[in-house]
Amino acid sequence: MHPYRTHDCSALREENAGQVVRLSGWVHSKRDHGGLLFIDLRDHYGVTQIVIPAGTDLLEKAERLRVESVITVTGKVVVRHGSQRNPNLPTGDVEVLADALEVRSSAEVLPFQVAGNENYPEDLRLKYRYIDLRRDKMHQNIMLRSKVITSLRQRMIEQGFTEFQTPILTASSPEGARDFLVPARLHPGKFYALPQAPQQFKQLAMVAGFDRYFQIAPCFRDEASRADRSPGEFYQLDFEMSFVTQEDVFTVLEPVLAGVFNEFTPEGWKITDGAFPRIPYADAMRDYGSDKPDLRNPLIIKDVTDAFRDSGFGLFAKIAASGGQIRAIPAPGAGDRPRGFFDKLNSWARENGAGGLGYIIFGEEGGKGPIVKNLEADRVESIREICGLKAGDAVFFAAGKGDEVAKFSGVVRTKVATELDLIEKNAFRFCWVVDFPMYELNEETGKVDFSHNPFSMPQGGLEALNTQDPLTINAYQYDIVCNGVELSSGAIRNHLPDVMLRAFEIAGYGPEVVEERFGGMLNAFRYGAPPHGGAAPGVDRIVMLLADEPNIREVILFPLNQSGEDLMMEAPAPVEPARLKELHLALDLPKPKPTASK
């Protein structure tokens, strides 16, 4: 017999009755019933109930065991009858009557319990992550992640993609976030950077003549944590294709994502059927107030600026006259809500930096509310018609200029739909956001700058760069969004040196700057580069959605905390002066802030 196990803890069934077996695992829980001791023994695969009979030498040894101790049990499989069966366990029809028990490793008192579903402080869980990962939900999340990655990889291979690995030690990149820098000992004063993405390498692979590349790529960015963004390190399904249009990229990625979500989505959930909707960026900002629209939310924002222009409602009339916008967020069914509902949303708006949240309630005899007192009846009716509302509905307003009012109206849209319970449940709704602007106006400097990826091909090519207002030029750039979460950015790349130099020139970067910063890729394009494009869906975010977790750290094996610290390994940590000297580095640490005198 094997020294540790003949079966795993999920394997035994009624047909094993009478067999002598050996199991190893962790003591998940113990229960004492009238002299008999029951142990739930857990391993990676499942749980089996162990019975320690009364009047045996094993009982005293088993009673001394702490939960989470590791043991090996040998005994006979017996069938459980009637109410003793546990339908919640695959092994619930049998148990093992122990006749030998060996302690492999005793556990000390736990910092928190593995059994149960209590919420413990995140920092405590991360400090003892190896214990946290024993909890059933966490174990399932990490196994789901592994299966999702396997599925993604297989689906890419089936579409003719080849997996390559790109360098981890590289040069600083233009992705936008701060780099993690690694001092080069053999080259004093110089640094490698950990890649923010394999962007330039995957494009160079296309220049090298490889046609379809992918990898599950680690990416490193020194940026702040969010619920859907892990600080420091994350993984993406990075891919690139030669001789493709934007639609070719969509045709490849849609079945990969739809297939993975169909494979791992809980039963009864709905997924976007057929081709994912394509929404131009301008339309997304107009209709949803976001470039990451959540299509589970049925509300569509409407522009009602003209209804307030030269109207009796002075505040909005003034905003309209000065070039601002008034946006209406429909609230179907909200007309029956008490006054407190509207006051609560008004207070919420103020807490979020707005002056308030105006509204109109529609009844059988017209509109009601503070705005209606100073707004002509025909204008109230016009707003109702534009928004497609009826008696018993309401509408909220956001007013201001440019992107600021667009984004705030999007936040209001989400808040109103949440409060009215309008967001579709148990569904994954995908869309592409396309036609991103190539450039934007930097509000601080007043100069034109790239709005997103500087290596995207401008729509219209060199002619557009030479003849159009830069702020009217769109790029062949796209995002894929699911339930309001951006899963991926991508683009058809700018592979023509003259177009690239002109694109950077418009953004204020001379040819010498481009040559210095991106000379490796630019030179490669001078030796014959195919048209190419790709994308890079975030693996962590995909798993977060499929696991229905609100925080991305719940689907990462050993994540950093919100402050970018590894509490378990105590990183980052100071290093010895001798190591700094070896690297020719000196520290210039910030001075501690003075404490107030008493």
UniProtKB/Swiss-Prot annotation:
One of its GO terms (molecular function) is ATP binding. ATP binds at R221, D222, E223, E486, G538, V539, D540, R541. One of its GO terms (biological process) is aspartyl-tRNA aminoacylation. The record marks H33 as: Important for tRNA non-discrimination. Aspartyl-tRNA synthetase with relaxed tRNA specificity since it is able to aspartylate not only its cognate tRNA(Asp) but also tRNA(Asn). Reaction proceeds in two steps: L-aspartate is first activated by ATP to form Asp-AMP and then transferred to the acceptor end of tRNA(Asp/Asn). L-aspartate binds at E175, R221, H452, R493. PANTHER family: ASPARTATE--TRNA LIGASE, MITOCHONDRIAL, ASPARTYL/LYSYL-TRNA SYNTHETASE. Its EC number is 6.1.1.23. Disulfide bonds: none annotated. The keyword DNA repair does not apply. This is Aspartate--tRNA(Asp/Asn) ligase. InterPro entries: Aa-tRNA-synt_II, aa-tRNA-synth_II, aa-tRNA-synth_II/BPL/LPL, Asp-tRNA-ligase_1, Asp-tRNA-ligase_1_N, Asp/Asn-tRNA-synth_IIb, AspRS_core, GAD-like_sf. It catalyses: tRNA(Asx) + L-aspartate + ATP = L-aspartyl-tRNA(Asx) + AMP + diphosphate. Gene3D superfamilies: Bira Bifunctional Protein, Domain 2, GAD-like domain, Nucleic acid-binding proteins. Homodimer. NCBIfam families: aspS_bact, PRK00476.1. It comes from Gluconobacter oxydans (strain 621H) (Gluconobacter suboxydans). It is found in: Cytoplasm. It comes from the Bacteria. HAMAP family: Asp_tRNA_synth_type1. Keywords: Aminoacyl-tRNA synthetase, ATP-binding, Cytoplasm, Ligase, Nucleotide-binding, Protein biosynthesis. Its main location: cytoplasm. The gene is aspS. Belongs to the class-II aminoacyl-tRNA synthetase family. Type 1 subfamily.
